[in-house]
Structure formats: structure tokens, C-alpha cells
A protein has these predicted regions:
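Non-transmembrane, aqueous-exposed alpha-helical and coiled segments at domain scale
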Residues: 1-214
Length: 214
């Protein structure tokens, strides 16, 4: 393995059970790049810095970042993959009609309200590599129907895009959080290292930032 294969090859071997072809390898690497970093504002990146600044070791700070992953941040991939896979044989219009009152995982973003650029980049990469992009196309169809029914745009977000790539590559939906963390932990380590190099004291909220309820 050490002589002949890359880290990406080993990810496929351990999580799918076989080695990838070159196109599969390229798409997974693109997905991992898309997930690695999206600004200090993300909970999985600033929380490790707070923990590191409090005097903790690298592994403790990294663990805090992992625990920051939840249904509202990085943790919707599994549900999005399950949703896309469960409904892939249905028409997008019928799916949205059935779930119009639900929060459909993998759609909508706090910042990218008109469209997540990471989603578009992964879709274009998959297309260029020759993948059928069945799950991407289904996701975009749901996006259009959501806009029709709700009157506002809820774009396929990065969680939905990662879900589409995972399914395209034949991975189990339950690996969603694992893939996000495989990528994100690199950025976590970078931020923790940077924090450890600072001479600042630990972070503490100012009294004006705390709302007291009487």
C-alpha cells in the first residue's frame, strides 16, 4: 500500500472495499477540498481555537471541533444522502409536495442564499469527469420545485453536494459525517496550531456581549 497507493486510494479501500479508478479518485479529492475550510466563523473552526487558547493540547482542541459538528453544521450530509437515495425514483414535484412542511436536508444556506459555489464547482467537476450526476440533477430539480412552492430559493448546499458525490461514488450514506471530518480536521489542525503560536490570553466574552435575563 505504501509503495503503490495514495491516501485517497486507501480511503476507498477501507470505506468502500475496493480501489478507485482515476476519475473516482479525482472526484473524491475535489469533494475533500470543498469541505476543508470555509472561514473562521464556522463552529468547527473557531471552537477549537477557543479550546486551544485555554491551554489545551492539540488532540483536545481537535476533539472539541469534532463535537461541534451537528445537524446545523456539517452534520446534514447523512440525512441528505438518505433523502436523495430514498426518493431517487420519484419525481421532484411529488417529493417536494410530500415534504413541503419539512426541512429537507441538504438545501438552503445561511450565507449562500442564491447558490452555493462549492456545489456548482463539485457538479462541474463531476460532469467534466464523465459521471452521470444523477443525484446532482435530482437535487437541482428539488431546488427548483422548492422555489416554486415556497417562493424563495433554497439551493442545494455543500451538505447536499457531498451527499450527491458520496452516492455517485457508491459510498454508504452513514459515512457522511466521517467524510466531512476527514477533510475538516486538516483546517482544524491549522487553526489550532496558529492559536498555539499566539501569545494571547484565553478568550473571554465581554459583559456587553452577554445578555442577562432578569
Amino acid at each position: 500500500l505504501i509503495e503503490k497507493h495514495s491516501f485517497t486510494d486507501v480511503i476507498f479501500l477501507l470505506l468502500r472495499g475496493d480501489f478507485p479508478n482515476e476519475k473516482e479518485k479525482a472526484l473524491l479529492e475535489a469533494m475533500l477540498v470543498a469541505s476543508v475550510e470555509n472561514g473562521l466563523e464556522a463552529p468547527s473552526l473557531y471552537i477549537p481555537r477557543v479550546v486551544a487558547a485555554s491551554g489545551n493540547d492539540m488532540h483536545v482542541a481537535l476533539a472539541s471541533g469534532m463535537l461541534a459538528i451537528g445537524s446545523k453544521h456539517g452534520g446534514a450530509v447523512e440525512k441528505a444522502a438518505e433523502f436523495l437515495n430514498d426518493h431517487k425514483e420519484e419525481r421532484a414535484e411529488a417529493v417536494v409536495e410530500e415534504h413541503i412542511k419539512d426541512v429537507i436536508p441538504g438545501f438552503g444556506h445561511k450565507i449562500y442564499k442564491e447558490g452555493d459555489p462549492r456545489t456548482r464547482a463539485l457538479y462541474e467537476k463531476a460532469k467534466a469527469l464523465g459521471f452521470p450526476c444523477r443525484f446532482f440533477d435530482f437535487g437541482f430539480a428539488i431546488e427548483k420545485e422548492l422555489e416554486k412552492k415556497k417562493g424563495k430559493k433554497l439551493p442545494l448546499n455543500i451538505d447536499g453536494a457531498i451527499a450527491a458525490v458520496m452516492l455517485e461514488l457508491g459510498f454508504d450514506a452513514r459515512l457522511g459525517k466521517a467524510f466531512f471530518l476527514i477533510s475538516r480536521i486538516v483546517a482544524m489542525a491549522s487553526h489550532v496550531k496558529e492559536e498555539m503560536e499566539q501569545k494571547n490570553s484565553y478568550y473571554r466574552l465581554d459583559e456587553t456581549e452577554v445578555q442577562n435575563e432578569e
